[in-house]
């Protein structure tokens, strides 16, 4: 009997996914090569990536809505850096709701001014901050939608006129959700999608 894993990760995969992957590792689509033997620049691998990106957008309800999905290395923690590196020109706002948002704030400060608009640190992150002002001149607002360590989750997403960015590593694909509220979001694969080592990034 297959074990269940109720921790934050790694994700338990459906049997049909394991079976399809094991077949592809032996030989991919009758091409005479294993999935792990083909070039990452080959047409076969390009097709795999394009299908994965397209299916991700479809599952997220973002197909045909002006979003692009990409898979990157480095885990979600790398996105703490890359988000600020690419988007932070003047100043950004962050909501501090736990361990991962604390780390995101620390990394973003390497690239510019970071405003911690609200925090639940005063009560050991046991609630999601509410009732804060969001300046209109921010480059973006960053939130972490779910906090596995402290057991808190956004039930409503902040309404804002500035671009909204989210770390959704631990609750992406977990519930019906209007992902179009976000201008960019990212998630490490190992919690809800598959093996560790890759991050899904979706950007408008």
Indicate residue ranges for each PLM-predicted region.
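Active-site PLP attachment segment
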Residues: 181-204
């Amino acid at each position: 009997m297959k074990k269940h894993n109720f921790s934050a990760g790694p994700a338990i995969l459906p049997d049909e996914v394991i079976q399809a992957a094991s077949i592809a590792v032996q030989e991919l689509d009758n091409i005479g090569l294993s999935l792990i033997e083909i070039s990452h620049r080959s047409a076969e691998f390009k097709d795999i990536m394009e299908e994965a990106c397209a299916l991700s957008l479809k599952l997220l309800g973002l197909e045909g809505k002006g979003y692009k999905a990409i898979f990157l290395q480095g885990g979600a923690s790398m996105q703490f850096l890359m988000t600020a590196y690419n988007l932070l020109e003047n100043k950004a706002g962050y909501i501090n709701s736990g361990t991962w948002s604390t780390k995101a704030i620390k990394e973003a400060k390497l690239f510019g001014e970071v405003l911690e608009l609200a925090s639940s640190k005063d009560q050991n992150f046991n609630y999601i901050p509410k009732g804060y002002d969001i300046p209109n001149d921010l480059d973006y607002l960053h939130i972490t939608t779910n906090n596995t360590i402290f057991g808190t989750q956004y039930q409503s997403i902040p309404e804002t006129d500035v671009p909204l960015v989210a770390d959704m590593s631990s609750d992406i694909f977990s519930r019906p959700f209007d992902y179009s509220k976000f201008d960019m979001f990212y998630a490490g694969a190992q919690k809800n999608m598959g093996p560790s080592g890759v991050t899904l990034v979706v950007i408008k």
